[in-house]
């Protein structure tokens, strides 16, 4: 079974999650962040998936629906939305979220539980992870990446990994050098062990998953690391979100992330193809269905339904769904949320390390 935490680390991209969950943050022209963990699970044969929601999950439910787009609309197993009970946001952290969906965990008949958030963009084959877990006889297998910890990553866990792959040490939010093994927030564990560990933490009023569940039990459990060397970007800041979208301009990244043998599924919206005016010019950009381009677009990501007026120049921008840009505008290093209107002849300039953000439904 799989469990996806749709609200984790929302504070890192507060501009984008003010009215939506982390899981429903748009990405890559037509996707949402939750599409990547959900598709990876489905492609790996996981047919029972629970999505833990804490708040602002209306857009998430609209996107997921019955799970039909991921072949999870079925009589047995399928997709389950797990909102908080009693109208409250529930206990804090991943442990609190697991405690709130304890009935779902106990009801499942699956042997293993795969836990992950929505803030890491990657396309993982979890069959390889399960094979590694069984081969090592691990109680817990954590997915990690070797390299420099992303800047502004929330409470990063850094592991000390032995030659056999066993985790012998764990530091949280250290001043770690490059080349360390840091956590991607993905974990495989036996379902019955997870229920026991969560119950033990809750009974002691301990709600930090990394400190209280993992770090505290590191000596008594067999914890192994699975190093993922493919493309993975953690959305831990607005700049990181911008950079992750810009990374899609690289054909090698697109080929790996959107591997036809492990497709990324999403909700299908019936739109007309993108339309280009006589004076339009588009280079090195991702332009989604439904766009109307009459100006110049360079090195940018345009989501569905975006309109670019005549003589408008868009460079190094991420323009979300149904936004309208008037004529004669100049935009460079701008992140624009949904349904924004930019009037004629406006000039908006940011920088690669500090892109300008325009909030949802704003008029500039």
Where are these regions (language model features)?
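Left-handed beta-helix
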Residues: 1-6, 192-193, 200-364
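Unchanged
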Residues: 1-247, 358
